[in-house]
Amino acid sequence: MFKAIVGASTLQDALDSVSVLVDECKIRLNEGELAIRAVDPANVGMVDLALDTAAFESYTADDGVIGVNLSKLEDFIGMASGDQLVELELDEETRKLNIQMDGLSSTLALIDPDSIRQEPDIPDLDLAAEIMLEGAQLDRGIKAADMVSDHVRLRVASDTEAYHIEAEGDTDDVDFRLDTDDLIALTAGEADSLFSLDYLKDMNKAIPKDAEVTIELGQEFPVKVHYGIAEGYGEITYMLAPRIQSD
C-alpha cells in the first residue's frame, strides 16, 4: 500500500532532480523514505534520491515499487501551486496512482517496474577533493563554460587551494575561479577531470540557486554532486562519468 500527502513544491523538486536524466523510473515506496535511483540511457549520468517521511504531511507505505512516466507525473503535479498539498494513493488493483489536489482529481497509469532499466549501483569512490559552494555559484560557472565549449574541466589545485570551472573553445577560454574565502568549505586535494557540459547543464537545472552544493572530485574520476531539498529531509546525489582524454 501507499498513501501520502506532500507539498507540491517538495514533490516537484524531487521529481525534477530525476527527470533531467531519465523519462521513466522506479519509485521505491519504503517504510522510512521514498527513494529513486536511475541512470541515463548512455550510462553516463546517475541520480540517487532519498526523501524522508518527515518531508511529507503524512506517509504510509509498505516497501512497494512502482514504475512511472516522469513527464506525465510532473504534468499532473504541475497543476498545483507550490504551497498546495498533493494527495497520492496507490490503487493496487488497477495499478494506477490516484492524485488529488485542490478539487482536482486524476489517475496516472503506472509502468511495470520490470520493464524499466535496472537501478545502478553507486560505487564507493575515494575522491581527493571536496568543494562546498552555493548553487548560484555553480550555475554561474556552468553558464560561463557553456559560452565557449561543450565540455568543462573541474579542477582543484592543492597548492593554491582554489576551485576552477574551466572551458576551452576553438578561440575562447573561460576560467571561473573560487578561492577558499569564496566557498562554504574546501578540502583541497589534487583533482582534475573533464566532463560533458550537456549533462552538467541538465543537472544544474534541478539544483536550487540557494542550495548548499557539495562536489566530490578526483583525477579523471566520476564527480559526485550532492544537495538537499525539503528543508534537509531530502538528499539528492548525482554522479557523472568523466570524459577520458587520450594522450
From Swiss-Prot:
Q: Would the keyword DNA-binding be found if you checked this record's keyword annotation?
A: yes
GO-annotated molecular function: DNA binding; DNA polymerase processivity factor activity
User: Which Gene Ontology BP terms does the record give?
Assistant: leading strand elongation; regulation of DNA replication
Keywords of this entry: DNA replication, DNA-binding
List the SUPFAM superfamilies. Answer: DNA clamp
Q: Which residues cross the membrane?
A: none
Which superkingdom? Archaea
Which InterPro entries does this UniProt record tie to the protein?
DNA_clamp_sf, Pr_cel_nuc_antig, Pr_cel_nuc_antig_C, Pr_cel_nuc_antig_N
Pfam families noted in UniProt: PCNA_C, PCNA_N
Q: Look up keyword DNA-binding and say if it applies.
A: yes
PANTHER family assigned? PROLIFERATING CELL NUCLEAR ANTIGEN
What is known about what this protein does? Sliding clamp subunit that acts as a moving platform for DNA processing. Responsible for tethering the catalytic subunit of DNA polymerase and other proteins to DNA during high-speed replication.
Task: Identify its protein family.
Answer: Belongs to the PCNA family.
> What does the subunit section of this Swiss-Prot or TrEMBL entry state?
Homotrimer. The subunits circularize to form a toroid; DNA passes through its center. Replication factor C (RFC) is required to load the toroid on the DNA.
HAMAP family of this UniProt entry? Answer: DNApol_clamp_arch (MF_00317)
Q: What is this protein called?
A: DNA polymerase sliding clamp
Organism of origin: Haloquadratum walsbyi (strain DSM 16790 / HBSQ001)
Gene behind this protein: pcn
